[in-house]
């Protein structure tokens, strides 16, 4: 009975122990269940001279394990971040309260705020600190509050200013102080104060000083002010500043340091026109200045200085294709249809033609060959005014007879430019564009303008001064009906073929009128033709042009400069230069004008700068002297003239150009009145544009003579040639060496030289369309008619009566240089002349000897037979002489020509006097005999012809 309760007790004990064990485990597991908790963000403020940070919200870490000991307590805070000068301290473990404090002295001027993260951790499960749990990371922003520890400091040690008397200045100068504190409250300067009493000046909160009354230079020349500054924390500057304000007498604003006359010497490059100019603003505060410099060149040439070559040459220089026909060329032997037109009467600048409403020029047939179906270009310089509403024709192609149809025409109507182009007859009879209208101020503003029409049916493009313009109106018309009537091209009016009179006369000035068929004018060519050779230039050094805006007009005649800094603007103005790139510019005045606009901070008191007017005097360039030299007189055999090569007219031609300069005396003799300036001639190089070879005397006969040149060589040189009955004209802008080479190639041919004794030619070269002319270089070529000397001697031996013709032929050559047998020799040397004369004289003596022997023989025969031929009163009775009447006439004619030639040669060629004299002496010996040959003299007296006894 007692044993039964034992198992039940044991079971209860086991259950109790198990319950105790189970309950204790649950309690232990619930000791540190939760992590500490912090606010996500904290904002703090700390003063730079304190170390405690005031946080919002306060730093308190919460733990749900509270109030358990250890697990519910906060043991510390941990700060995360690099170089964070703060640490966090737990004030109360049970409440989790803590503080953040700085570890070192903070400086707001170095760093104004800090940002870092912080974590809280509890005490763990027990005193050993195991099982510690950490909160999430919270962000902390801390701002360092400034302390007014720095006083204001002025930027400058002293200030200076100058003002003009008698003005109320809105601001004379500004004093400025700074504060090193970091906060806006203590770093800003809130006020300035003038400490000097009884002065007529005030200073505002921004530091601007102005006068309270008008200053008087006579009363006070200079004021000295002491000025201090306060920051917004009322802290005064430790050091006050001294301000000196000078009073200046009344000032006149404007440009100073410029000269009204600037002399420009040609060929010197760019010339600074305002090297010492500066703008006097009379110390007015200037916000900006705009200065416009204008060069007035409208009175020079066609608006400015340009090359004055012929328009055809200018087109070639600008790269235009060949085929340009010039309708208003300078008058010459080859282009003479503009002779009657009034011109500018000078060659210093472009040659222009004036039309007064009653004049017109008929263009010869063949000058222009135009196919309206193909592209073509019309180019012209025009100056025209508002002369009313009548049509005024520039260029017109119309029917020559029977009808008044206009085929194409360029005319003005008021301020409109109109181009008419009627299509040629075609199978399609439908309307086509025929009349193109442009309304432009340039047509009637009385200034020179350059007009270029690019015609490519059905469109026409107009360029005025290089700017393209589309027609505002295009009128259509039917093509012309077919006829066989020729057309007449006229400049300055339009020919009415049906009425046989001119109409629609032009009033104005024209120049450079050209027509070119084929390829249209390129824009680069058009710009090149319009570009001026003179203008204003501004080359600013690398360290300059700071803050200065520069604008240049397309014509280089207007420069506009704008800048805020007057000093920098002055530097830019001092670098403005005048440049004329022509070797021989047009002399005269180019007016200069400066207009200025000044903007001030206080526009009510802004200054006005009066305009400046001056001029550039382009001096007369040293006039070049173009000299042509070479052989003036030579003779050639007739066979050379008749050969295919002909005779070179200018084989040794030399072309040089020189200028004469005045050389000032050296410094030692500059003050000596007896020392005079010396003239020095120096050779220069420039181009030529024309060389004209004309024949003197009768015009060239194309049936028997010509002037020829290798055209292929000319094209390589870029030179054109025009032939006429008067000679040839070479045109094209090329070097003197090129023209020299071309003239060496010019040859004269004559394939009927029997009646030709000589031919004379004249050569003149020019530069700049006749502005500079060379000397007249004259050449005389003689034709030598010769026979075979051996055959002639035999003939004379057999026929003594021909001695006199041979003698005459020899005399014909006296006074001339005998031709060298070498085809390239120009003038035979003296030795050659002597040899030829000696050989001729020897032949003559042989013939004379034969004649005398025969005469002696005849005299012996006569003595033997004295009864025969008693009627003859001379010894050579047996001699029968037959005289050719034609030879007698030729002898007389030749003798007259011989005397004239000898007289001309004695006056023209003094260097040939020796040859002439020797030839005359030989001739006289033949006619009269020498002083030592008395027998010959007697014989000559005996040989007196009795024409009555001669039988023909």
From Swiss-Prot:
Annotated site, Cleavage, chain positions: 795-796, 824-825
SUPFAM superfamilies of this UniProt entry?
Cadherin-like (SSF49313), Concanavalin A-like lectins/glucanases (SSF49899)
Can you summarize the PTM annotation of this record?
Proteolytically processed under normal cellular conditions. A primary zeta-cleavage generates a large extracellular (soluble) N-terminal domain (sAlc) and a short C-terminal transmembrane fragment (CTF1). A secondary cleavage catalyzed by presenilin gamma-secretase within the transmembrane domain releases the beta-Alc-alpha chain in the extracellular milieu and produces an intracellular fragment (AlcICD). This processing is strongly suppressed in the tripartite complex formed with APBA2 and APP, which seems to prevent the association with PSEN1.
Q: Name one Pfam family in it.
A: CLSTN_C
User: What spans are recorded as compositionally biased (Polar residues)?
Assistant: 934-952
Show which residues sit on the Extracellular side of the membrane. Answer: 29-830
- Cadherin domain sequence ranges: 38-154, 155-255
Cellular compartments annotated: Postsynaptic cell membrane; Endoplasmic reticulum membrane; Golgi apparatus membrane; Cell projection, Neuron projection
Q: State the name under which the record lists this protein.
A: Calsyntenin-1
Please list where the region (Disordered) is annotated. 886-952
Q: Which family does it belong to?
A: Belongs to the calsyntenin family.
InterPro entries assigned? Cadherin-like_dom, Cadherin-like_sf, CLSTN_C, ConA-like_dom_sf
Keywords annotated in UniProt: Calcium, Cell adhesion, Cell membrane, Cell projection, Endoplasmic reticulum, Glycoprotein, Golgi apparatus, Membrane, Nucleus, Postsynaptic cell membrane, Repeat, Signal, Synapse, Transmembrane, Transmembrane helix
Q: Which organism is it from?
A: Rattus norvegicus
According to UniProt, the tissues expressing it are described as: Preferentially expressed in the retina and brain.
Keyword Cell membrane (UniProt): yes
Question: Domain remarks in the entry?
Answer: The cytoplasmic domain binds synaptic Ca(2+).
Give me any GO biological process, just one: regulation of synapse maturation
Q: Write out the GO cellular component annotations.
A: cell surface; endoplasmic reticulum membrane; extracellular region; GABA-ergic synapse; glutamatergic synapse; Golgi membrane; membrane; nucleus
The record describes its membrane topology as:
Single-pass type I membrane protein
Biased composition regions of type Acidic residues, renumbered to the chain: 896-930
* Origin superkingdom: Eukaryota
């Amino acid at each position: 009975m007692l044993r039964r309760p034992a198992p039940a007790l044991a079971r209860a004990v086991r259950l109790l122990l198990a319950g105790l064990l189970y309950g204790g485990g649950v309690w232990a597991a619930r000791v540190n269940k939760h992590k500490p908790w912090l606010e996500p963000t904290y904002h703090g403020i700390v003063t730079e001279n304190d170390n405690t940070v005031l946080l919002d919200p306060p730093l308190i870490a919460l733990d749900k394990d509270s109030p358990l000991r250890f697990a519910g307590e906060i043991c510390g805070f941990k700060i995360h971040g690099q170089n964070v000068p703060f640490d966090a301290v737990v004030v109360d473990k049970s409440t989790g309260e803590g503080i953040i404090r700085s570890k070192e002295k903070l400086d707001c001027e170095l760093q104004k705020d800090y940002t870092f993260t912080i974590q809280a951790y509890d005490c763990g499960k027990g005193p050993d600190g195991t099982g510690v749990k950490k909160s999430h990371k919270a962000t902390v922003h801390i701002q360092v509050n400034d302390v007014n520890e720095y006083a204001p400091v002025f930027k400058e040690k002293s200030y200076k200013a100058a003002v003009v008397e008698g003005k109320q200045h809105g601001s004379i100068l500004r004093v400025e102080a700074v504060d090193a504190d970091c906060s806006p409250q203590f770093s800003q300067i809130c006020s300035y104060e003038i400490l000097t009493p009884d002065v007529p000046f005030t200073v505002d909160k921004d530091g601007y000083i102005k006068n309270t009354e008008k200053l008087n230079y006579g009363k006070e020349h200079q004021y000295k002010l002491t000025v201090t500054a306060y920051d917004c924390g009322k802290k005064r500057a430790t050091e006050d500043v001294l301000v000196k304000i000078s009073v200046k007498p009344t000032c006149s604003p404007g440009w100073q340091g410029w000269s009204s006359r600037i002399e420009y010497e040609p060929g010197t490059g760019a010339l600074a026109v305002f090297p010492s100019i500066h703008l006097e603003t009379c110390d007015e505060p200037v916000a900006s200045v705009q200065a416009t410099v204008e060069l007035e060149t409208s009175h020079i040439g066609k608006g400015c200085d340009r090359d004055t070559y012929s328009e055809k040459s200018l087109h070639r220089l600008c790269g235009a294709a060949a085929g340009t026909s010039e309708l208003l060329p300078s008058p010459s032997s080859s282009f003479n249809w503009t002779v009657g037109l009034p011109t500018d009467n000078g060659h210093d600048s472009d040659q222009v033609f004036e039309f007064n409403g009653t004049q017109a020029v008929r263009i010869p047939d063949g000058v222009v060959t135009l196919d309206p179906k193909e592209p073509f270009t019309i180019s012209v310089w025009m100056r025209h005014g508002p002369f009313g509403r009548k049509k005024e024709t520039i260029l017109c192609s119309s029917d020559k007879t029977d009808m008044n149809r206009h085929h194409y025409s360029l005319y003005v109507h008021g301020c409109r430019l109109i181009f008419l182009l009627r299509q040629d007859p075609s199978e399609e009879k439908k309307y086509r564009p025929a009349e193109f209208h442009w309304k432009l101020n340039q047509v009637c503003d009385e200034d020179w303008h350059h007009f270029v029409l690019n015609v490519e049916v059905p469109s026409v493009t107009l360029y005025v001064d290089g700017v393209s313009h589309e027609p505002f109106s295009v009128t259509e018309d039917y093509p012309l009906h077919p006829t066989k009537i020729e057309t007449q091209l006229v400049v300055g009016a339009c020919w009415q073929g049906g009425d046989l009179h001119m109409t629609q006369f032009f009033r104005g000035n024209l120049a450079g009128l050209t027509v070119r068929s084929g390829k249209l004018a390129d824009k680069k060519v058009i710009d090149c033709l319009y570009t001026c050779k003179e203008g204003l230039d501004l080359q600013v050094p690398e360290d300059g042009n700071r803050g200065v805006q520069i604008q240049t007009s397309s014509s280089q005649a207007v420069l506009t400069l704008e800048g805020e800094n007057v000093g920098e603007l002055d530097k830019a103005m001092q670098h403005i230069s005048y440049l004329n790139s022509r070797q021989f510019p047009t002399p005269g005045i180019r007016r200069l004008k400066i207009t200025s606009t000044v903007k001030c901070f206080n526009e009510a008191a802004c200054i006005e700068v009066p305009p400046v007017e001056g001029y550039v005097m382009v001096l007369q360039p040293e006039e070049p002297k173009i000299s042509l030299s070479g052989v003036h007189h030579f003779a050639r055999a007739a066979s050379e003239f008749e050969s295919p090569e002909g005779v070179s007219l200018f084989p040794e031609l030399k072309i040089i150009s020189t200028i004469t300069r005045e050389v000032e005396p050296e410094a030692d003799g500059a003050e000596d009145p007896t020392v005079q300036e010396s003239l020095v001639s120096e050779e220069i190089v420039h181009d030529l544009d024309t060389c004209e070879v004309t024949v003197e005397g009768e015009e060239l006969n194309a049936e028997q003579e010509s002037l020829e040149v290798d055209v292929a060589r000319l094209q390589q040189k870029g030179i054109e040639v025009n032939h006429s009955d008067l000679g040839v004209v070479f045109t094209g802008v090329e070097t003197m060496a090129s023209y020299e080479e071309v003239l060496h190639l010019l040859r004269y041919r004559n394939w009927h030289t029997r009646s030709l004794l000589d031919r004379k030619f004249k050569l003149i070269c020019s530069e700049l369309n006749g502005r500079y002319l060379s000397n007249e270089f004259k050449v005389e070529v003689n034709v030598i008619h010769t026979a075979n000397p051996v055959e002639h001697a035999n003939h004379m031996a057999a026929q003594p009566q021909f001695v006199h013709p041979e003698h005459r032929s020899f005399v014909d050559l006296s006074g001339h240089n005998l031709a060298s047998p070498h085809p390239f020799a120009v003038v035979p040397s003296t030795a050659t002349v002597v040899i030829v004369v000696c050989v001729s004289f020897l032949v003559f003596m042989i013939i004379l000897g034969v004649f005398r022997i025969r005469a002696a023989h005849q005299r012996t025969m006569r003595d033997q037979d004295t009864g025969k031929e008693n009627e003859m009163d001379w010894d050579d009775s047996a001699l029968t002489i037959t005289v050719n009447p034609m030879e007698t006439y030729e002898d007389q004619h030749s003798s007259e020509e011989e005397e004239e030639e000898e007289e001309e040669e004695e006056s023209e060629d003094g260097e040939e006097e020796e040859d002439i004299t020797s030839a005359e002496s030989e001739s006289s010996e033949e006619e009269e005999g020498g002083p030592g040959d008395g027998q010959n003299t007697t014989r000559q007296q005996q040989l007196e012809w009795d024409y009555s006894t001669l039988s023909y």
